[in-house]
Amino acid sequence: MNTIFNSSFLLIFITLMIPLVTSLSPKKLNPSPSSFYVKTAVKISFFISLIPLFIFLDQGLESIVTNWNWMNMGPFNINMSFKFDLYSIMFTPVALYVTWSILEFALWYMHLDPNINRFFKYLLLFLISMIILVTANNMFQLFIGWEGVGIMSFLLIGWWYSRTDANTAALQAVIYNRIGDIGLILSMAWLAMNLNSWEIQQIFILSKDKDLTLPLLGLVLAAAGKSAQFGLHPWLPSAMEGPTPVSALLHSSTMVVAGIFLLIRLHPLIQDNQFILTTCLCLGAITTLFTATCALTQNDIKKIIAFSTSSQLGLMMVTIGLNQPQLAFLHICTHAFFKAMLFLCSGSIIHSLNDEQDIRKMGGLHKLLPFTSSSLTVGSLALTGMPFLSGFFSKDAIIEAMNTSHLNAWALILTLVATSFTAIYSLRLIFFTLMKFPRFNSFSPINENNPMVINPLKRLAYGSIIAGLIITSNLPPAKTQIMTMSPLLKLSALLVTILGLLLALELTNLTHSQFKIYPTFPYHHFSNMLGYFPPIIHRLLPKINLNWAQHISTHLIDQTWNEKIGPKSTLIQQIPLIKLSTHPQQGYIKTYLTLLFLTLTLIILVVFI
């Protein structure tokens, strides 16, 4: 069994590496574009990854660990260690399936880009880094995958490097993620110094009697940076400056879920530390509500979907705080399908409307782009947790776990409100984009009759509909489920979703009777300005630092050193002596008479006394 798992994953890595290795050859091995090879390699890898998945589900195995010694440094060893358990074996096919669809869509979306082959290789490296992170069984190997997705996100977000906004967004992503990386590096240093090992299994065993609050805080900081939790979230909506396929891959199954996956993988360290669990719970609750609030008033179609991603990541962090990592992993898997489909639908709409992203300038697309409109509707309903779509199976389970837990009721209320907000902005997106009459230029090249558009959306739509049922049917519960529950608690998630839909319909009706150009609702600007985070963090703080630095340089260097201590001070001290010495040389008779009188007085005193 071990041989089959090792061979399958080795074959996956080899298949994914072939397009990268062949591109290093000075001679072209085949005149066909390498972008097709990348898509084909990911497709083949997906079917290979199904072999260990079916065997794993059939045999009911726990996990398989494979070690190869890499480096010896006295008592501290670094190994190449792969862990094939439920998380890695189930996540890998999901990531490959979603990436296959995104790459096929990118063949159509990026066909005019002169560097499309390099673009596809970057996406492939992005995927390989995520698979390395998911299958890693030691912290060093996990860190390689962690940094891999970080650097590839920088290259892909800033793909259109001639645009200032794209460069700024790429730098912003790197800086915010570097803050999180500091937490991961410090945690790894603490583990190496106190436990003398980076092997995850050994860390679980050796840390039984240790106080792990400090390294776990570092891990939470790392997850907050990579998964865009509150405080380190501004880079996620800014990342929409990259191409739409990048946004789809970034938000569905790679980088943004890496932070949550880190906490899932190391959850045995967290499960008994109440301080860290409470931190995750409160951080996730604030994140999911704040970002859902920001999504309510956005007009950029990609930013609405981006904030919905951040809100769902907050929901996953809440689930970590509830001590339910398997539910967080379930939501990662189901979320990947409909979130990738939402981004691909937005890319299809943007491409068809001459790169227009403002939903106020859309409308009436349900007749012009029927397949894209249907997919967008299915994805939005899955996002809201509509029954029997994939999002329902994970979101409903999370809300049930919160309702039946004895933990923070405040976090529960925030999460329920955020769930209602999810329904509001999802229906708002559908209403402005697909309904009513067209509000765009009639000369837009609207066309979705391309297999490279329809096939990816079709596959992701299938996943958004049935993936939740398939995964929950084969995912064994890690903890005892709640056997009895009142109907009100059972239906709470559905009730708040329906409440949000009704509220969204009421708000859309109010827009027709609004006579003032600017909204009169007092909190509109708070939501539309992203909680004033960008002005405060990116403008006010640098301005304060600049003014403080100028004040210090002016007062400390110019006034204190130059005027009170340095050259000017020396000059001022010499002025009285200079005046005293130059006074007798000015040619005044009274001065000469005074000197003569003093001289005669001294002579008389010396001679006669």
UniProtKB/Swiss-Prot annotation:
EC number: 7.1.1.2
UniProt keyword list: Electron transport, Membrane, Mitochondrion, Mitochondrion inner membrane, NAD, Respiratory chain, Translocase, Transmembrane, Transmembrane helix, Transport, Ubiquinone
Cellular localisation: Mitochondrion inner membrane
Membrane topology field: Multi-pass membrane protein
Domain of life (superkingdom): Eukaryota
GO molecular function (one): NADH dehydrogenase (ubiquinone) activity
A cellular component annotation (GO) from this entry: mitochondrial inner membrane
Pfam families assigned: NADH5_C (PF06455), Proton_antipo_M (PF00361), Proton_antipo_N (PF00662)
Keyword Membrane: yes
The UniProt record lists the keyword Mitochondrion: yes
Transmembrane segments annotated in the record for this chain: 4-24, 44-64, 89-109, 119-139, 140-160, 173-193, 212-232, 244-264, 275-295, 304-324, 327-347, 373-393, 407-427, 451-471, 485-505, 589-609
GO process annotations (BP): ATP synthesis coupled electron transport; electron transport coupled proton transport
Catalytic activity: a ubiquinone + NADH + 5 H(+)(in) = a ubiquinol + NAD(+) + 4 H(+)(out)
Function text: Core subunit of the mitochondrial membrane respiratory chain NADH dehydrogenase (Complex I) that is believed to belong to the minimal assembly required for catalysis. Complex I functions in the transfer of electrons from NADH to the respiratory chain. The immediate electron acceptor for the enzyme is believed to be ubiquinone.
Protein family (similarity comment): Belongs to the complex I subunit 5 family.
Record's protein name: NADH-ubiquinone oxidoreductase chain 5
Source organism (scientific name): Scyliorhinus canicula (Small-spotted catshark)
Gene (name only): MT-ND5
